[in-house]
Amino acid sequence: MGPVIGMTPDKRAETPGAEKIAGLSQIYKMGSLPEAVDAARPKATLVDSESADDELTNLNWLHESTNLLTNFSLGSEGLPIVSPLYDIEGDDVPSFGPACYQNPEKKSATSKPPYSFSLLIYMAIEHSPNKCLPVKEIYSWILDHFPYFATAPTGWKNSVRHNLSLNKCFQKVERSHGKVNGKGSLWCVDPEYKPNLIQALKKQPFSSASSQNGSLSPHYLSSVIKQNQVRNLKESDIDAAAAMMLLNTSIEQGILECEKPLPLKTALQKKRSYGNAFHHPSAVRLQESDSLATSIDPKEDHNYSASSMAAQRCASRSSVSSLSSVDEVYEFIPKNSHVGSDGSEGFHSEEDTDVDYEDDPLGDSGYASQPCAKISEKGQSGKKMRKQTCQEIDEELKEAAGSLLHLAGIRTCLGSLISTAKTQNQKQRKK
């Protein structure tokens, strides 16, 4: 479309584009803010007569006082404030705030309680001695403490039943067969969702109708809340104490293992059991175990032979000597010989301690002797013990290296014997 030419000023004012252009031109000419605001008003008021401008209210009073609510009074005529807490049937009976209860003479007995149905059920169950009620007793408790429901429509009972069956905060408890308490099942509060109900009860105001009854006073409700808080705090304290005890026991055990000496009954135990019969002359049976075991009762593991020490040794020694776990005794036993006899060929490596060895009565049965260390506690200082442990560790490592080399030599010899025997058998079969 081309530009509109030949239009009258009245018609230009009726069109929106012309109205905007005219308003902007007037604002540009005037320059001041109040005049610009007046000029930016719709042209429909300017087209009318001057009497229409006189009927408009002057807005200068807005700048005189910033508090616009001083002349207004908030009374009971205002709309009720809807609480943000809703339950499953909250649309039928909304919960209101304290603005509805400023006239207790008029609305004391007939006013709606500020609690949702879930909170009403919770208060009824908590008020009972057994903390569980059937549906009929919940109805009667609500009617006794909130007279509003006596004249209310009967739909509130359906709301109570729906909350009991659909709300996760409540759970059904079956009646015991031995007791005859009537028909139906009992309802109680789920302990998992109990803190949520307590928190919702804190946010709700106390109504004047409920405060008239002594059993449902604000003091009673606050006492119920405090009791539940104390229970929750006790449970949390018990959990925290148990966790701290576990942490402390683990830390103390670590400290005891590193700093405190071992008791007298603890012993160094090594596995020294070997096979005493071989079906093949080249078979070698080796059973290895950890070098140290700090087990008090030697019956816990039947593969370990108990050997007690009379002296207390630091756990640091056991941790360092655990490096010598390769220190084991290896024995090579031929086919036509018994363990411990004169014809047996074997290599023995024992722990070198700073005491004399005693005769082992189990030496003929294939067990290597493990002497008991007899060290006087008073005559030796800590430095001597450290030096002795270092020397023993070095000797144990040397013996372990020698035993490993000896074992490697035995295995190579056995491998060569087996290979030659196989080749001879193959040659005989070919012939």
From Swiss-Prot:
Residue ranges of the annotated DNA-binding region, renumbered to this chain: 112-208
Principal place of residence: nucleus
Biological process annotations from GO: regulation of DNA-templated transcription; skeletal muscle cell differentiation
Superkingdom as given in the UniProt entry: Eukaryota
Keywords: DNA-binding, Nucleus, Transcription, Transcription regulation
GO cellular component, one term: nucleoplasm
Compartment list: Nucleus
Pfam hit, one: Forkhead
InterPro entries: FH_FOXN2 (IPR047403), Fork_head_dom (IPR001766), FOXN2/3-like (IPR047119), TF_fork_head_CS_1 (IPR018122), TF_fork_head_CS_2 (IPR030456), WH-like_DNA-bd_sf (IPR036388), WH_DNA-bd_sf (IPR036390)
Function: Binds to the purine-rich region in HTLV-I LTR.
Protein name as it appears in the record: Forkhead box protein N2
Biological classification of the source: Eukaryota, Metazoa, Chordata, Craniata, Vertebrata
